[in-house]
Amino acid sequence: MSEDEISIEGDLFEEPEGFLPERPSSHFSTYKRKIPNAEPQEITMKLVGHNPLYGHLLWNAGIYTADYLDKHSDTLVQGKKILELGAASALPSLVCSLNHAKEVIVTDYPDPDLLSHMEYSFNDLKEKTKYELSPWKVKGYIWGHDLGELLFDEPGRKLAEEEKFDLIILSDLVFNHSEHHKLLDTCRQSLKRNGGKCLVVFSPHRPYLLQDDLSFFETAKQYQFKTEKIEMVTWKPMFEEDEETADIRARVYAFFLIPEWE
């Protein structure tokens, strides 16, 4: 059919105005460090406008994790190889990069928009601080998948012990109950046997499923991890609705997973 045989005014495939809601714009969030005289005192993150896995928000667990790593950087961060899973805002990794980590690998679901925002935050911090950041890489990674491809672009390659991580950060991930085994498998395969730790921090976003959140630590036994509770603190809940559950949603739990395998 030639163009002369049919004439349609306008764009046939253009959606009518207002047909779809406008996609939320990217936004910025600023974190203030609690360490006196820390430089820089503030870290600004560029967050996506919306993300189905809630990567568009800076959660209490992420702030707690950043605070904790900043405070204990001498034992947990300095000179250490660090992996963050499900990083979203990447705040804990940004703090690690300021605290002389040997290397920081920052991962989340391989969504180009989400990854580019994390990359932006690192580059912005690099430009704003007079101090050199630790080497970092932002990578897309699906929990339980090939680690050789993630770290070396070599599918199927197994990690030698010296290539594994001293610290793995899991901040606000255990709400995803169907993924517990995949998370733990990734940790089991990539954490150093001697001296390695996983830092697991979360808030109960769905209070009626708190026991399912905590089941993560029971499942961890199957992967030869010992659980050490750091603390449980109470902050202001992220959202004000449902006053009856506010006291549970305000909680922030922190644990270490310690390897027990030979």
UniProtKB/Swiss-Prot annotation:
Q: Which controlled-vocabulary keywords does the entry list?
A: Cytoplasm, Methyltransferase, S-adenosyl-L-methionine, Transferase
MF terms from GO for this chain are:
N-terminal protein N-methyltransferase activity; protein methyltransferase activity; protein-lysine N-methyltransferase activity
Annotated EC: 2.1.1.-
| Biological process according to GO | methylation; rDNA heterochromatin formation
Indicate yes or no for the key word S-adenosyl-L-methionine.
yes
Positions annotated to bind S-adenosyl-L-methionine = 59, 86-88, 108, 143, 171
GO CC annotation terms, alphabetical: cytoplasm
Q: Which domain of life is it from?
A: Eukaryota
Q: What class of enzyme is it?
A: transferase
Q: Which Pfam families match?
A: Methyltransf_16 (PF10294)
Q: Which SUPFAM superfamilies does this one have?
A: S-adenosyl-L-methionine-dependent methyltransferases
Location of the protein in the cell: Cytoplasm
| Keyword Heme on entry | no
Q: Which family does it belong to?
A: Belongs to the class I-like SAM-binding methyltransferase superfamily. EFM7 family.
Q: What does this protein do?
A: S-adenosyl-L-methionine-dependent protein methyltransferase that trimethylates the N-terminal glycine 'Gly-2' of elongation factor 1-alpha, before also catalyzing the mono- and dimethylation of 'Lys-3'.
Could you tell me which HAMAP family the record lists for this protein? Methyltr_EFM7
Query: In its UniProt entry, what is this protein called?
Result: Protein N-terminal and lysine N-methyltransferase EFM7
**Which organism's genome codes for this protein?**
Candida albicans (strain SC5314 / ATCC MYA-2876) (Yeast)
